A protein has these predicted regions:
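N-terminal helix initiation/capping motif
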Residues: 1-23, 96-102
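Short coil-to-beta transition motif at edge beta-strands of beta-rich domains
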Residues: 1-3, 35-47
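Beta-strand elements of well-folded, non-transmembrane domains
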Residues: 8, 46-48, 64-66, 82
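Short coil-to-beta-strand transition motifs
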Residues: 11-13, 51-59
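Conserved hydrophobic positions within beta-strands
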Residues: 18, 60-62
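Short, conserved beta-turn/loop elements at beta-strand boundaries and strand-helix junctions
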Residues: 23, 65-71
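Short alpha-helix capping/helix-loop boundary micro-motifs
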Residues: 24-29
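C-terminal output/interaction extensions
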Residues: 69-102
Length: 102
């Protein structure tokens, strides 16, 4: 399973771990709830030996948040915004390599 650390690029603050991703959206698991209806500038590191760039940086709007099955964590769903073709290809490669499926 691919649990990359996800950061707010504007503040440098660690937000949580990527739990799932598609070209349309992502789910992040975090220790505290994230604000809804907010556009975040997100970034996550990529293994340099696999992907053409070191980080995946993207804008995403938080659209839902709920408690995880573990009450110490929260799941937040994001709609990904304005991805370019290279980022879509990287996300599709992540889906294939780490078995993310709808």
């Amino acid at each position: 399973m691919f649990y990359s650390r996800v950061f707010n690029r504007k503040t440098g603050r660690f937000l949580g771990y990527l739990e799932n991703i598609t070209p349309e959206g992502a789910m992040i698991i975090s220790e505290s709830p994230l604000r809804l209806d907010e556009v975040y500038s997100l970034g996550m590191s990529l293994p340099e030996d696999i992907y053409p760039k070191l980080a995946l940086n993207f804008e995403a709007k938080s659209i839902w948040c709920k408690s995880d099955i573990d009450p110490n964590f929260y799941n937040t769903g994001f709609q990904l915004l304005d991805l370019d073709e290279e980022d879509i290809a990287i996300i599709e490669q992540i889906i294939e390599e780490y078995n993310f499926r709808d």
